[in-house]
């Protein structure tokens, strides 16, 4: 299994991914400043893929199909883009939203584009003893199975949060660059193997 790369197409670079596992990016959250004041009501009325309910949330929610994303557009000109599966897609989507706003007659720019959060996931393909892990790594772990089935591991370096499930599925969140996602996973992998459940 170790040589199965992304979608099994190319081999994994073991210098970068010694575990042989490359976390898949699931969601990118980015922000950009359109640098102009926006009339949200006008945008919601003119754009067909937009909804605006100011009583519920003070932003226009807009969606596009390609890349499949959702944007939150605020009257201040600030915008949040979520749902993209890569940094490039997130930037492309944000540019498309900016263009839609321009076409509606606002002098929208594209300032300070920034990736705010990268969410990745992977599967180590073996079950994990979460109680043992939580006990041994108490300073970084919170595990309360009555409240949430996963162990929450707050890594200090890089500053990343991992959700570790008994099944061996891992969610990695908090990265601003994808290498932090990869580094965090490689840091935790030896710990996971140490607390591997012996299957009866």
Curated annotation (Swiss-Prot):
Sequence repeat windows: 25-101, 115-192
InterPro entries, per database record: TBP (IPR000814), TBP_CS (IPR030491), TBP_dom_sf (IPR012295), TBP_eukaryotic (IPR033710)
GO biological process terms, semicolon-separated: DNA-templated transcription initiation
UniProt keyword annotations, A-Z: DNA-binding, Nucleus, Repeat, Transcription
Keyword set includes Transcription: yes
Transcription keyword on record: yes
Protein purpose: General transcription factor that functions at the core of the DNA-binding multiprotein factor TFIID. Binding of TFIID to the TATA box is the initial transcriptional step of the pre-initiation complex (PIC), playing a role in the activation of eukaryotic genes transcribed by RNA polymerase II.
HAMAP family named among the record's database cross-references: TATA_bind_prot_arch
Family label: Belongs to the TBP family.
Protein name: TATA-box-binding protein
Lineage: Eukaryota, Viridiplantae, Streptophyta, Embryophyta, Tracheophyta
């Amino acid at each position: 299994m170790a040589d199965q790369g992304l979608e099994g197409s190319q081999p994994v670079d073991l210098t970068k991914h010694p575990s042989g596992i490359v976390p898949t990016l699931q969601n990118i959250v980015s922000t950009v400043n359109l640098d102009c004041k926006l009339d949200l009501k006008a945008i919601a009325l003119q754009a067909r893929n937009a909804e605006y309910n100011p009583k519920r949330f003070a932003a226009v929610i807009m969606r596009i199909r390609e890349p499949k994303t959702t944007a939150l557009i605020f009257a201040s000109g600030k915008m949040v883009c979520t749902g993209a599966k890569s940094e490039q897609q997130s930037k492309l989507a944000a540019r498309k939203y900016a263009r839609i706003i321009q076409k509606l007659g606002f002098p929208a720019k594209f300032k300070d584009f920034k990736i705010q959060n990268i969410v990745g996931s992977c599967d180590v393909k073996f079950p994990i003893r979460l109680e043992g892990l939580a006990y041994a790594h108490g300073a970084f772990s919170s595990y309360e199975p009555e409240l949430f089935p996963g162990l929450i591991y707050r890594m200090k370096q890089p500053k990343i949060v991992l959700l570790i499930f008994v099944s061996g599925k891992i969610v990695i969140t908090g990265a601003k660059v994808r290498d932090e996602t990869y580094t965090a996973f490689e840091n935790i992998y030896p710990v996971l193997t140490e607390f591997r459940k012996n299957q009866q």
